[in-house]
């Protein structure tokens, strides 16, 4: 099973420590199954979706912040159309304040 931890950063020069920490936390046995993908908010929705689709994850996690939340919401709408069997997980400060509400709004999301 392939896991994709995804960050959408504010700038190309930024990186997201959360996805690196999560991958490190799974342990050496599982690390080969965890891939990281970093994009920026300046990339098009189509480009990001293509980058995700090429990796063919079975499970994808998004690190959600104020600067990327609008774009991630768009991705959540489109992603099930191209990867219908992929589980979607959300984390970060933009999704932890109202998990039940977000799960109602985005039924395609597996969990927070």
Give a label for each model feature.
Residues 18, 25, 33-112:
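Glycine-rich beta-alpha loop elements in corrinoid/cobalamin-binding modules
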Residues 1-3, 26-33:
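N-terminal subdomain of nucleotide-sugar transferases
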Residues 12-18:
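Short N-terminal binding/cap micro-motifs at the start of the first secondary-structure element
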Residues 1-11, 59:
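Nucleotide-activated donor-dependent transferases that construct or modify glycoconjugates
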Residues 11-12, 65:
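Short acidic-aromatic active-site loops that bind/stabilize oxyanions
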């Amino acid at each position: 099973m392939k896991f994709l931890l995804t960050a959408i950063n504010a700038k190309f020069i930024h990186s997201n420590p959360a996805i690196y920490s999560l991958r490190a936390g799974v342990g050496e046995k599982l690390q080969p199954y965890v891939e990281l993908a970093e994009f920026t908010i300046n990339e098009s929705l189509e480009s990001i979706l293509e980058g995700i689709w090429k990796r063919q994850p079975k499970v994808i996690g998004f690190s959600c912040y104020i600067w990327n939340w609008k774009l991630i919401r768009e991705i959540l709408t489109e992603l099930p159309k191209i990867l219908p069997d992929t589980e979607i997980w959300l984390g970060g400060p933009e999704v932890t304040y109202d998990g039940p509400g977000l799960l109602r709004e985005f039924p395609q999301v597996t969990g927070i």
